[in-house]
Amino acid sequence: MELKNELCTVLEQIKEKTPLVHHITNYVTVNDCANITLAIGGSPVMADDHKEVEDMVSIASAVVLNIGTLNERTIESFVLAGKKANELNIPVILDPVGAGATAFRSQTIEKILKEVKLSVLRGNMSEIKNIYGTGTQTKGVDSVDSSLDGGKEIAISLAKKLSCTVVITGEVDIVSDGNKTYAIQNGHKALSSITGTGCMSASLIGACCGTGKGILQGAILGTMIMGIAGEKANERLKVHEGLGSFKVYLMDAVSNFDQDDIRKRGKVDEI
C-alpha cells in the first residue's frame, strides 16, 4: 500500500507540473511517443539536431533516448543530450531498441553507456540480456527470448553495474534499482502486436521520472500505466474491432488514467 501511495503522488505531480520530456527517438513511433506523453499529462519535445539538443535539455524535466532508427547524426545528439542532462541532474532514460541486432547498434549502446550516466534502462528480455552480456540473439527489434528465468538476477546485477534502474518488459515486467526489485503483472498480449508500445513506455517513464519524486517509483509507474492501459483497451474491444481500435483505446486509457487505476488495478509486488 505504501508503494501505491508513492505512485499516486507521482501521478499527481505529473498533472501539476506537466514535465517537459525531451525525446531523441526514432521516426517510426515519434508521433505515438509525443501523444502518449501528452495523454498522461506531460509535455513532449522531439528535437534531435546536435546544434540545439543541449539547449533543449536545459529546459527539460527528463530525457528519453531511443535508438530505434540509428544514424550518425543522432548518435552525436544522444551523447550531447545525455551529458548535458547529467550535468543538470536531469533523469536520462535509454531504450536500447534492437540491442544486439547489428554491430553498429551494439557499438552505439556501448558508447552511450560509457559517456552518459543513465537513470533508467528499459528494454525487453533479449535487449537487456544482450547488454548484460549473455549473448542472447536479437532478431530485428523483436524479442526472441521471452523466458523470465533469471530475469530478476539480471535486472539486479545490471542495475548495480550501471548504477541505474533497470526495467525488463515482458509477460511479467521486472523493475530493479539493485536494492529493491518489483514484478508488475499488468498488461495484455495485444500490446506486443502494435508498433511502439515499448517506445511509449519509455516516454511514460520519462514523464513519471520528470516529477522528481523518485526514479524507481517513476519506472514502476510508467511501466504499470502501459500495462493497465492495455488491459482496459482490450476490455473495450467489440467483436468486430481489432488492433486499430485497440491502439485508439490504449491512448484513451492513458489519458483517463487516475489514482483508482493504481490502487484497484495495479499488480505490483516486491520480489
Curated annotation (Swiss-Prot):
It is an enzyme of class 2 (transferase). GO terms for molecular function: ATP binding; hydroxyethylthiazole kinase activity; magnesium ion binding. It catalyses: 5-(2-hydroxyethyl)-4-methylthiazole + ATP = 4-methyl-5-(2-phosphooxyethyl)-thiazole + ADP + H(+). Substrate binds at residues 46, 196. Its cofactor is Mg(2+). Pathway: Cofactor biosynthesis; thiamine diphosphate biosynthesis; 4-methyl-5-(2-phosphoethyl)-thiazole from 5-(2-hydroxyethyl)-4-methylthiazole: step 1/1. GO terms for biological process: thiamine biosynthetic process; thiamine diphosphate biosynthetic process. Pfam families: HK. ATP binds at residues 122, 169. Keywords: ATP-binding, Kinase, Magnesium, Metal-binding, Nucleotide-binding, Thiamine biosynthesis, Transferase. Its EC number is 2.7.1.50. NCBIfam families: PRK09355.1 (NF006830), thiM (TIGR00694). Catalyzes the phosphorylation of the hydroxyl group of 4-methyl-5-beta-hydroxyethylthiazole (THZ). This is Hydroxyethylthiazole kinase. It comes from Alkaliphilus oremlandii (strain OhILAs).
